[in-house]
């Protein structure tokens, strides 16, 4: 395998799989990815001042990797109405956040109009403070809410966009293979449905992120299949702003408790995912985000030297990783984020949701 040639060529799915299977050239793969990263985006590492608002942890979903959901009767359950969500968004804006990420569980009472009310109230309450970028609702949430009020996805997305939705998180992707999905999230939208929601969003002016959750029951071939689907969508729509690998946090997940998964990904796989995704995507998808919440600061810093060029955000409130067993905190100050970047000789730059730099 001629790794040097991979710096320039648009590698095939077969070559991508060979990289995942390669056990002899680990550090060489990381170096190739780092060279591509430097050529593509330089030594700038971006971050965003943001807040996560999870408006409910009650969910009818059956995802076997999720430790966040509860039943309505659970004393730890919560459900924030649109006014409460707006209050949290205002607090985030006053604290300096330029982005708020809003997500919640799946319930019959959560329809597109409920989502639109959240957006409208967040937009209105933050307007006199310069507004805030609203990054909200996964493809699964959009589809479920649309079905709850008899709309199709395109109709729902128009209502959400008109109500203030700027971008969407490309979560609920997990692994884009229906055999795997039937095992880990049997009632979630299918691969083709996820693709449809995302493409429809892109074609109607709503950009999204894209994600991949790895380190559970998938095989290397499924990782390649997933990355290939994302790459083909990006070639068609140019609608992804970033790729976010999400390492599976196993400790509190049902998959772990029922014995399907003994542990999550190794540190080697974590770094290979960042490196190989950089080599595979090249300039089709320039921004690859490392997750300090899931990886911790030190491994995230290493990932900045093998493909990643963004460290995500300050978060301010992040409940899902914490519930799953994440042990690296759920909030980081801007100063700490910048130091995390500076300490690996990179240049920190603040950005907004669309990766436009902020002075």
UniProtKB/Swiss-Prot annotation:
Signal sequence interval, chain numbering: none
Pfam family, one: CofH_C
Record carries keyword Protease: no
Radical SAM core domain residues: 45-282
Required co-factors: [4Fe-4S] cluster
EC number from the UniProt entry: 2.5.1.147
Binding-site list for [4Fe-4S] cluster: 59, 63, 66
Pathway membership: Cofactor biosynthesis; coenzyme F0 biosynthesis
Keyword terms: 4Fe-4S, Iron, Iron-sulfur, Metal-binding, S-adenosyl-L-methionine, Transferase
Details of cofactor binding: Binds 1 [4Fe-4S] cluster. The cluster is coordinated with 3 cysteines and an exchangeable S-adenosyl-L-methionine.
Complex and partners: Consists of two subunits, CofG and CofH.
Function: Catalyzes the radical-mediated synthesis of 5-amino-5-(4-hydroxybenzyl)-6-(D-ribitylimino)-5,6-dihydrouracil from 5-amino-6-(D-ribitylamino)uracil and L-tyrosine.
Name the UniProt record assigns to this protein: 5-amino-6-(D-ribitylamino)uracil--L-tyrosine 4-hydroxyphenyl transferase
Organism: Methanococcus vannielii (strain ATCC 35089 / DSM 1224 / JCM 13029 / OCM 148 / SB)
Gene that this sequence comes from: cofH
């Amino acid at each position: 395998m001629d790794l040097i040639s991979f710096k320039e060529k648009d590698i095939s799915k077969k070559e991508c799989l060979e990289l995942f299977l390669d056990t002899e050239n680990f550090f060489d793969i990381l170096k190739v990815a780092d060279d591509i990263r430097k050529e593509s985006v330089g030594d700038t590492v971006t971050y965003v001042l943001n807040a996560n608002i999870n408006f409910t942890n009650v969910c009818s979903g059956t995802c076997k990797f999720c430790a966040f959901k509860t039943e309505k009767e659970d004393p730890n359950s919560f459900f924030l109405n649109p006014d409460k969500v707006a209050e949290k968004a205002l607090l985030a804006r006053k604290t300096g956040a330029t982005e708020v990420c809003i997500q919640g569980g799946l319930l019959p009472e959560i329809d597109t109009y409920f989502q639109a009310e959240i957006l409208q109230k967040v937009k209105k309450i933050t307007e006199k403070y310069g507004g805030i970028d609203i990054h909200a609702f996964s493809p699964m949430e959009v589809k479920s809410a649309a079905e709850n009020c008899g709309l199709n996805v395109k109709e729902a997305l128009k209502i959400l966009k008109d109500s203030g939705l700027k971008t969407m998180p490309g979560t609920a992707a997990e692994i884009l293979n229906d055999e795997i999905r039937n095992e880990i999230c049997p009632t979630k939208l299918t691969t083709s449905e996820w693709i449809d929601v995302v493409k429809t969003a892109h074609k109607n002016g709503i950009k999204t992120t894209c994600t991949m959750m790895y380190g559970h029951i998938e095989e290397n071939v499924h990782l390649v299949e997933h990355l290939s689907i994302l790459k083909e969508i990006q070639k068609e729509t140019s609608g992804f702003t970033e790729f976010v690998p999400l390492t599976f946090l196993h400790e509190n997940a049902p998959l772990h408790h029922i014995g399907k998964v003994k542990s999550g990904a190794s540190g080697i796989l974590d770094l290979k995912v960042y490196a190989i995704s950089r080599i595979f995507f090249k300039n089709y998808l320039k921004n690859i985000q490392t997750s300090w919440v899931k990886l911790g600061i030190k491994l995230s810093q290493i990932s900045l030297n093998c493909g990643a060029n963004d460290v995500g955000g300050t978060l301010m409130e992040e409940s899902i990783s914490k519930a799953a067993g994440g042990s690296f905190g759920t909030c980081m100050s801007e100063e700490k984020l910048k130091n995390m970047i500076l300490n690996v000789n990179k240049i920190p730059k603040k950005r907004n949701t669309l990766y436009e730099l902020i002075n």
